[in-house]
């Protein structure tokens, strides 16, 4: 009982400490001007990481220190962005949305804490609103909810077409964006610590390989999100696969399997309500058996192609929102992982140095100390003195200096 009382008291003290908290140096909404991001009137570069688990761990007040540790370690290395989930759907442990329109307040307060702590420490957040994959609910859960209400649905991709499911998604958007943070007392849609929303993690629609179904969904949902929240940037959460609008790129750059997923990098980002382009580089997932030289050559072609198209066709910034090299990749070595990071960062820096469209890169993924249950093949602990962390820190330093030089 004494322990419980202490935890409750501690939570109250922490909550009170956020009210009227001074703005961190990074405070202010991130906007864009052409192919560059702008923060407080000056160019801003997105150096960062993925940590999907932040709200999950923050749901328990006794493990919130992990979020604090990660954010503090990140800022000490010069990192500026964390990309994380704003969803956890269905009958799962610590679900955020337990049923359409029904939310677990304790889990929502976990997300509140993540945002408040990011604001206090000086990290900007990119928050995703749903998952393409079944993990943590995803579009499959939305389809299951609709089926349980008598809707006739035959595929998980009915997520994009069924009007009831689309209303479920819109209601989730409204609930999250209008949420008033219990720590800061600021609505999410008014919170500068949030850099951007992404419509979905890795949107795909395999039942319509033409890309029309996914395109129609983005055309509907992107303006809807903007109607609820005009303050924040918005992107798709796209992997970067080319579609029929770019047949040459589709044939020369896409992994063969990507030609059937109904996504279109150019068309899906070439609408006014989408502020910046998103791409991933899953070379270890798409081409597991490549030798290192071939892998690095693909990364170079993939990144440079998207950067060029963001610059010349979309005329918007592009963020590499996921990249890395998993330890389960055949012939994996730490040196090979370092090579992937170095090659990736060099290409991003070369564009940014010229004022180009490459606005930053977010590696997959960060975990905190003592999180072996969350550790995956690509997990990195920032407090480790690994060679990869040194590469991350050096790139952040260079991009930070570039930002300072640009601001003069």
Curated annotation (Swiss-Prot):
The keyword Hydrolase applies. Its EC number is 3.2.1.78. SUPFAM superfamilies: (Trans)glycosidases. One of its GO terms (molecular function) is mannan endo-1,4-beta-mannosidase activity. Substrate binds at residues 85, 201, 364. GO terms for cellular component: extracellular region. GO terms for biological process: polysaccharide catabolic process. It is an enzyme of class 3 (hydrolase). Residues 1-23 form the signal peptide. It catalyses: Random hydrolysis of (1->4)-beta-D-mannosidic linkages in mannans, galactomannans and glucomannans. The active site is at 202 (proton donor), 322 (nucleophile). Disulfide bonds: none annotated. The keyword Secreted applies. Keywords: Glycoprotein, Glycosidase, Hydrolase, Secreted, Signal. Glycans are attached at residue 73. It is found in: Secreted. Coiled coil: none annotated. InterPro entries: Glyco_hydro_5, Glycoside_hydrolase_SF, MAN-like. It holds the Pfam family Cellulase. Belongs to the glycosyl hydrolase 5 (cellulase A) family. This is Putative mannan endo-1,4-beta-mannosidase 4. The gene is MAN4.
């Amino acid at each position: 009982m004494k322990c419980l009382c202490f935890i409750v008291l501690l939570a109250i003290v922490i909550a009170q400490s956020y009210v009227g908290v001074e703005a961190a140096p990074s405070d202010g909404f991130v906007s864009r001007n052409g192919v560059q991001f702008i923060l407080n009137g000056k160019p801003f570069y997105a150096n960062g990481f993925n940590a999907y688990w932040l709200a999950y761990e923050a749901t328990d007040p006794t493990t919130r220190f992990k979020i604090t540790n990660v954010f503090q370690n990140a800022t000490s290395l010069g990192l500026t962005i964390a990309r994380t989930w704003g969803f956890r759907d269905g009958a799962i442990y610590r679900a955020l949305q337990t049923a359409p329109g029904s939310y677990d307040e304790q889990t929502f307060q976990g997300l509140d804490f993540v945002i408040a702590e990011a604001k206090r420490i000086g990290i900007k957040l990119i928050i995703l609103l749903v998952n393409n994959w079944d993990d943590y609910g995803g579009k499959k859960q939305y389809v299951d909810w609709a089926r349980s209400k008598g809707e006739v649905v035959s595929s998980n991709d009915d997520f994009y077409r069924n009007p009831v499911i689309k209303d479920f998604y819109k209601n989730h958007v409204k609930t999250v964006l209008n949420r008033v943070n219990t720590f800061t007392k600021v609505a999410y849609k008014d919170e500068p610590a949030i850099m951007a929303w992404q419509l979905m993690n890795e949107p795909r629609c395999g039942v319509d390989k033409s890309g029309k179904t996914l395109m129609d969904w983005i055309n509907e949902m992107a303006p809807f999100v903007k109607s609820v929240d005009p303050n924040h940037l918005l992107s798709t959460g796209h992997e970067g696969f080319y579609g029929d609008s770019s047949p040459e790129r589709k044939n020369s750059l896409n992994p063969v399997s990507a030609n059937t997923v109904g996504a279109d990098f150019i068309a899906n980002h070439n609408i006014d309500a989408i502020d910046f382009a998103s791409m991933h580089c899953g070379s270890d997932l798409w081409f597991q058996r490549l030798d290192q030289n071939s892998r690095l050559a693909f990364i170079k072609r993939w990144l440079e192609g998207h950067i060029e198209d963001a610059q010349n066709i979309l005329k918007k910034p592009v963020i590499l929102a996921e990249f890395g090299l998993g330890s389960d990749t055949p012939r994996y070595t730490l040196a090979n992982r370092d090579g992937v990071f170095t090659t990736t960062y060099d290409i991003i820096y070369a564009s940014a140095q010229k004022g180009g469209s490459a606005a930053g890169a977010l590696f997959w993924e960060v975990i905190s100390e003592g999180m072996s249950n969350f550790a995956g093949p690509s997990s990195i602990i920032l407090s480790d003195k690994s060679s990869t962390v040194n590469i991350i820190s050096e790139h952040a330093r260079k991009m930070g200096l570039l930002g300072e030089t640009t601001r003069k």
